[in-house]
Swiss-Prot record:
Belongs to the IIV-6 201R/289L family. Residues 4-138 form the Bro-N domain. Residues 141-177, 343-372 form a coiled coil. It holds the Pfam family Bro-N. Keywords: Coiled coil. This is Putative Bro-N domain-containing protein 019R. The lineage of its organism: Viruses, Varidnaviria, Bamfordvirae, Nucleocytoviricota, Megaviricetes. It comes from Invertebrate iridescent virus 3.
Amino acid sequence: MNALINLKQSREYTTVTIDGQNHHIKLAGTMDDPYFCGKDVCSILRYKDVKQALQNKVKPKNKKMLSVLVKQDHNAVGVQTTSTRLGSNSPLTYNEGKAIYINEPGLYALIMHSNAPFAEEFQDLVYEQILPSIRKYGSYQLEMQLTQAMEQLSIKERDVQEAHEARIKAERKAVRVDKFMRRIAIKERKLEWIYIATTQQYAQERLFKIGSTSRLNTRIGHYNVGRPAEDSYYYCWVTKCYNSKDIDYHIQKLLVDFKHKNNAELYCSIKFSDLVAIVSFIVQHYDASIDYINSFIKTRLVASFDEEDGIPPAIDIRTSLANQGLVVDQDDIDVLIPQELNDSINEKVKQNLEEIVIERKELISKLADKTNISKKDLWTRIKDLTGWSSSKTVIINGDLNYKIIY
């Protein structure tokens, strides 16, 4: 598969060769924001119902009618509108104007959902040849226009330098965006698996193996090497995911208490339906975080690079917690105080001191950092819990005695 792109000769379409046959993809929009004919792309990716594919697979913000794109181009202001515009300059017929064109995210969406065997190869072609060629020629045209404008309008040297720096900045940003878009196009496809497997005998004993793989067919075979055929491993639940090894490790940490004491690869005691619910929940919520980041890269990354951002102000922890309703209640305080006292006592024990003495001010400061309760209220509760009455009071803590002093 390859692509033939010569924008100097024609900016109306790009040609993709698959199995020796040429396929044209009509273009529209601009070289900075190219649009592709949805029908042409669907035909290449072997979608049977073009209308349904464009309606269900591509979000509304990623597709436009050709007539809308042409109208936007004609209404645009600036020197770029003539020489960086893509598509035909001929008047549109009514049917041509209704044709749906998709932008870059829309193109990725159709590729991602396609069942065509060469979908990934076509995706690489888009990244490595089609889009770079459009953008490279667009950058060349922009530089030509800038030079002509400088000659015609006698732009001052300072303005020229600013324009040059702006172009360099835009090119660097484009490289960064392309890098992120390429990364998510790979990671956005769930190509790995989390599975639960067992045998007939193990199932009766509620013993299950949870694992990860990118090759379901071969993995189960490894488990059955040397096992009797009548009690071989089989899959009883599988699901696709983004990063199976990370999820597998996360599951192991969460379910460590259920591992079989004689075989750490097996999980025991949990009813199968409950185990499925637990593992499914872990996978879905792990994938949701990746979906969120991928969505941010596709929908907010460019704007996030460009938008102005002020320096965030410092916050008052206690006020912030109170505004969020995160008040530490009495039970929390009654747990925190003994914990902090034990930590302080252990530190003193390590120093081999003859007498264990804890400074009141230091103790309250440590507790204040962990709560939004006033130091006065903390000190009142410390006295209630320890029986403190003065700096001479000896407080008993198991085998150790200590004092809290001013």
